[in-house]
Amino acid sequence: MKHIPRKRFGQHFLADQSVLDRIVQLIDPQPGEALVEIGPGLGAMTDPVVERCKRLTVVELDRDLAARLRKRPELTVIESDVLKVDFTALAQAAGRPVRVIGNLPYNISSPILFHLLEQVASVQDQHFMLQKEVVDRMASAPGSKDYGRLSVMLQWRYQIESLLDVPPESFDPPPRVDSAIVRMLPLAQPPAVDPKLLGELVTVAFSQRRKMLRNTLGRWLEAREHGGAFDLTRRAEEVPVAEFVALTMAIQQTPSNSPLTAGATPDAA
């Protein structure tokens, strides 16, 4: 029986074989690797991937699709909301970091990316189909209109590369937006920064992105007793990722912002 895509799950199934072939080529799955596919759907990407790697773990929320997938012995099916999946446990069970792939539901793509960011130490790499606008934001450089919180929060921990643009007609049903394939490689030696503090800083900095940082970040820094040098006569979109990270690390050195005290009085900003 034909599966009808469910709007509430953001289902748009990739149907263009030439695009599928190119995606699998870019992923280059190998036997013995611990691959996890998010949202396998009807198996368009699943089939050529598992043909190469022989075993595959899939995460599928749609119970009807999960039931179909369970009939395949080469697949380990996790019927769950991906935001509840413990990728660290999957890596530990496999005895190696996981490679995460998938055509992500566009309506929850950012929460999925941040869920994986929290477990990035257990990830070898990530290859995703996403809304092109999101990929552009993920990979953008300072000074670009697309550069923002998402750019900083992912680039401090990943090397990000947009690999391939995919038009709407490659899907069934076609989405209303263009899509793109992105590759995310965790940095081998990431800076020793507190992700929560960095996230708070970046959120404040970009809260009014057209204003000078002295009007947004200035008070936040004062509240944290930061007296170091940082140019506040810029807009947030002009500040490189490395500077946001360095500023966060400097704030971490302030006694009142140490891990033992930083969470005691959360800032209302």
UniProtKB/Swiss-Prot annotation:
Main localisation: cytoplasm
GO MF annotation, one: 16S rRNA (adenine(1518)-N(6)/adenine(1519)-N(6))-dimethyltransferase activity
Catalytic activity: adenosine(1518)/adenosine(1519) in 16S rRNA + 4 S-adenosyl-L-methionine = N(6)-dimethyladenosine(1518)/N(6)-dimethyladenosine(1519) in 16S rRNA + 4 S-adenosyl-L-homocysteine + 4 H(+)
EC number in record: 2.1.1.182
Binding site for S-adenosyl-L-methionine: 12, 14, 39, 60, 81, 103
Disulfide-linked positions: none
Stored InterPro entries: KsgA/Erm, rRNA_Ade_diMease-like_C, rRNA_Ade_Mease_Trfase_CS, rRNA_Ade_methylase_Trfase_N, rRNA_adenine_dimethylase, SAM-dependent_MTases_sf
Pfam families given in the database record: RrnaAD
Keyword Cytoplasm part of the UniProt annotation: yes
Similarity section: Belongs to the class I-like SAM-binding methyltransferase superfamily. rRNA adenine N(6)-methyltransferase family. RsmA subfamily.
Protein name per the record: Ribosomal RNA small subunit methyltransferase A
